[in-house]
Amino acid sequence: PAAYGTDFGVILKPSDKILINIAAWYLYLDQEFVYVGDAGVVEPSGKSKRQGIDVTTRFQFTKNLFANANFNFTKPRAVGEPKGANYIPLAPTFTSVGGVYYKAQKGLNGGINYRYIKNRPANEDNSVVAKGYFLLDAAVNYTRPKYEIGLAFENIFNIKWNEAQFATESRLRNEPAPVTELHYTPGTPFFARLKLAVFF
């Protein structure tokens, strides 16, 4: 199936320490594919369109201290469906990633970064919602010419979040009929990892 898209963007550099990229875009698909949880496959669901704005920022505070943040705004809709029943299941509407990093060729280096996704429709009428999340990860390393020792932390605040999630029918033993509701795989809880690397 055909896909048609266009975008327009600008790159701004207000100073030698700041870089900003802003792009507006539009995408039209002759055929959208939607994940079917029960079957574990994707199936065609008609035409769709998306329009959005992406913002990318980069900052350099010092020779070794950096930061970045990306913001992605999207309005995804099915074409030819009535308003209120034209949502695209699981299509993100707002996501963002970013962080602050200290980078050095040797000695201590590391950073902290975040991941965010907003609540989004899990079915066509938005009666079932896929839950968003905000997670923080961090890492610190000690680097020498011959080796590196590091410690990484995922989900620092031990937030309960859903990783894979979708709307599908299920029925418990005491229920008279199947119910369409959110099914999900729990996301990784707080996790720490020790790293040792040897350079040859």
Model-predicted segments: where are they?
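Short, glycine/charged-rich beta-strand-loop motifs at protein surfaces that mediate ligand recognition
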Residues: 123-129, 136-140, 181-182
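Flexible, surface-exposed loop regions and adjacent strand-edge segments
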Residues: 30, 36-44, 83-92, 127-131, ...
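Gram-negative outer-membrane beta-barrel transporters
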Residues: 19-29, 44-124, 195-199
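C-terminal beta-signal and adjacent terminal beta-strands/loops
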Residues: 67, 119-120, 142-200
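Residues that define the transmembrane beta-barrel architecture of outer-membrane proteins
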Residues: 2-6, 47-51, 90-96, 132-136, ...
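Membrane-embedded beta-barrel scaffold of Gram-negative outer-membrane proteins
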Residues: 1-51, 60, 160
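Short coil turns and loop connectors of transmembrane beta-barrels in diderm outer membranes
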Residues: 14-16, 61-63, 75, 106, ...
